[in-house]
């Protein structure tokens, strides 16, 4: 980054604060909490405890403050997903791209959620996680398996990531920052 660009970014940060609220959803063991930790600290741990209910964490990237709702993915918590997805800047749906056995359930849960009228038009970011594992789907295969091309009522974006290796995490953060709302 050049000196002039750095100065302009600093100047902008004095006058413009950006905020966004996100809901991270997906089936259990997809890597939602790992994603929160990688975005917040850059750290990854193999020993994750399943999220019971939800966790909230605020992360600041540059002049953007991101409020992350990390929602449990077990069947008993899925009914509360809609409540935490209303009025967010974007819905982030995490999929274990190396677990083909759960893709049909994951697709069904996603499409059921997005059919709720309270969520109309909210941008969707689908993250195929665990691409470091053998047999992980490609972006094209995940897009097809999840029926993402049929979602025409909102912006839909898909990235393939690895929380373990931090693969494409910068792209995810860039997408999130671009979808934040200015608060001056």
Swiss-Prot record:
One of its GO terms (molecular function) is GTP binding. One of its GO terms (cellular component) is plasmodesma. Interacts with tubulin. Belongs to the small GTPase superfamily. Arf family. May play a role in lysosome motility. May play a role in chromosome segregation. (Microbial infection) Component of tomato mosaic virus (ToMV) RNA replication complexes. Required for tobamovirus multiplication, especially for efficient negative-strand RNA synthesis and viral RNA capping. NCBIfam families: small_GTP. This is ADP-ribosylation factor-like protein 8a.
């Amino acid at each position: 980054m050049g000196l002039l660009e750095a100065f302009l970014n600093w100047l902008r940060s004095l006058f413009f604060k950006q905020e966004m609220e996100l809901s991270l959803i997906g089936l259990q063991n997809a890597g939602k909490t790992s994603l929160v930790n990688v975005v917040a600290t850059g750290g990854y741990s193999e020993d994750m405890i399943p999220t019971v209910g939800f966790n909230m964490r605020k992360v600041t990237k540059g002049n953007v403050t991101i409020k992350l709702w990390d929602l449990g993915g077990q069947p008993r918590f899925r009914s509360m997903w809609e409540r935490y997805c209303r009025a967010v800047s974007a819905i982030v749906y995490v999929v274990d791209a190396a677990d083909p056995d759960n893709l049909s359930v994951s697709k069904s849960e996603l499409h059921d959620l997005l059919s709720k009228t309270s969520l109309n038009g909210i941008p969707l970011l689908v993250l195929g996680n665990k691409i470091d594992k053998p047999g992980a789907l490609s972006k094209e295969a995940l897009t097809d398996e999840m029926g993402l091309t049929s979602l025409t009522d909102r912006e839909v974006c898909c990235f393939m990531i690895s929380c373990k290796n931090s693969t494409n995490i910068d792209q995810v953060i860039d997408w999130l920052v671009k979808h934040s709302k200015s608060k001056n």
